Design a protein with these regions (language model features):
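Short, solvent-exposed loop/turn positions at domain surfaces
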Residues: 20, 73-74, 165, 177
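Hydrophobic structural patches
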Residues: 17-19, 171-182, 204, 216-218
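Extended intrinsically disordered, low-complexity coil regions enriched in Ser, Thr, Gly, Ala
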Residues: 182-197, 204-210
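Non-catalytic DNA-recognition/assembly elements of restriction-modification systems
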Residues: 12-42, 215-231
Length: 231
């Protein structure tokens, strides 16, 4: 049987910022204790497509949110505010987790977590936007075709917390900086895809035409293209 000291040692991360290497062991705290679920309501008349969030417009793979296509036909919806972390609780494996940067309303199948400490918002967001958390939710999910996470189980999710708030903030800042780089790279990739799509349209003859609109200099006098079978 492991001693308490052995368990404490196991709660020290392998990689740690130099100034925190002697700060002591981390501990696990239930999610409910640091970011409880909130059940506040807001009138639908105060919500628009821009600030309404449902399981449909939270994007997969921690991709953020899109503008909602429609609003529900109800009087009120769940309320969230900037700094909350939202989880689409239908088919959790789709990884629809979003850290809110504005206030609004959410559908009933979206869980709203509110960090008790406003300085811990980023940290909680990174904990929930993590495959380990998603695997945990799926392990306790109920249903086959449309599995839902078990709310009581989710509340008990063990969140690793360092002994000093400053370490928690530095970890969150580091991960957020990486997210920004990833986001910029994703935009570059999307831009390149659009550029390639445009080139494809220019480098091949359009329907009903025999020469492309854009041609390499050495082939501009090579004549018209024709159709042949490949292989």
């Amino acid at each position: 049987m492991r001693s308490k000291s052995d368990k404490k040692k196991s709660l020290v991360p392998r990689l740690r910022f130099p100034e925190f290497r002697e700060a002591g062991a981390w501990e696990f705290i239930p999610l409910e204790a640091i970011a409880p679920l909130v059940n506040d309501r807001v009138q639908l008349k105060d919500i628009s497509n821009v600030n309404y969030v449902s399981t449909e417009n939270i994007l997969q793979d921690f991709g953020g949110v899109a503008v909602a296509n429609k609003l529900p036909t109800v009087n009120s919806v769940s309320s969230f505010q900037a700094g909350d972390v939202l989880l689409a609780n239908i088919r959790p494996y789709l990884k629809k987790v979003w850290a809110a940067n504005f206030s609004g309303g959410a559908s009933n199948d979206v869980l709203v977590f509110r960090p008790r400490n406003s300085q811990g918002c980023q940290y909680v967001a990174h904990i929930l936007k993590n495959n380990r958390f998603i695997d945990y939710v799926m392990a306790g999910a109920k249903g086959v075709k449309m599995p839902r996470g078990d709310i009581n189980s989710i509340k008990e999710y063990p969140v690793p917390i360092p002994p000093e708030t400053t370490e928690q903030q530095k970890v969150a800042h580091c991960l957020s900086s990486l997210d920004e780089v990833i986001g910029l790279q994703a935009k570059k990739v999307q831009s390149l895809k659009q550029h390639k799509k445009g080139l494809m349209q220019q480098l091949f003859p359009a329907e009903g035409e025999t020469t492309p609109h854009l041609r390499f200099p050495e082939f501009r006098e090579a004549g018209a293209w024709d159709k042949q079978r490949i292989g």
